[in-house]
Amino acid sequence: LAAQNFDLKARLANRSEPFLFSWMTMPSSHLAGQLARLPIEGVCLDLQHGMIGFSDAVGMIAAVSNAGRPAIVRVLWNEPGLIGQALDAGAAAVIVPMVNSKAQAEAMVRSAKYPPLGGRSWGGYTAFQTYGMSPADYLKQANSMTQVFAMIETQAALDAVEEIAAVPGLDGLFVGPSDLSIALSKGVGIDKTAKHTLDAMKRVAAAAAKNNLVAGAFAGTAEIIKTYQGMGYTFMAGAVDVDLLQAGASSLIKSVKDV
């Protein structure tokens, strides 16, 4: 089973059920493959705040793809080489941090899409192999197959969200609620369900809906997933690798003590 059997764009177009994916911070292709076989729909590799480097990510993307799931990559920064590199390695989607203006969103799309939508540099034979396509077929379909999300996580991004959402070639908006809540509270704290955070997220979701974009967010827990889903979010990260390990170990110890 290979990645080309999973049409991420078509799946995200069906917004009746949320697309839930795990979030990886640890560099392990073995663990990535195992997570991809859990009853969730995708795996995101965090190259911004995780400990995953690009050389790690290549094998991890392959492991996720071989399990028939889409590999999503949060790149380190909004830089053409980093975005193109992730897509060349076979990522089905990239999440780009700190996109704070229309101009930055346009630059992101140029990095992620081939002409006429952008100016992505050609190359990356791993992507052809991942999708099981000839180079010619990949070129024809890459702009549609690969998804690019702009992260909304600052006051500046929120102020410009309607302009960002209208950028041609953008596939979705992805809220970083921790950074956004820090920004909105002026550094007081992190609260992913505070009123000011949720009000801001409603604005982001409305901008996404107006432009037929996917609304995504880092949720983390079942309760927060339900809250965000009620506001129109359908692309959400829920299971973090470190949290899964801690929960599994804690459950085992508790079970032993309860016997």
Question: Which role fits each region the language model picked out?
Answer:
Residues 1-259:
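Expand to "…catalyze enediolate/carbanion chemistry for C-C bond making/breaking, isomerization
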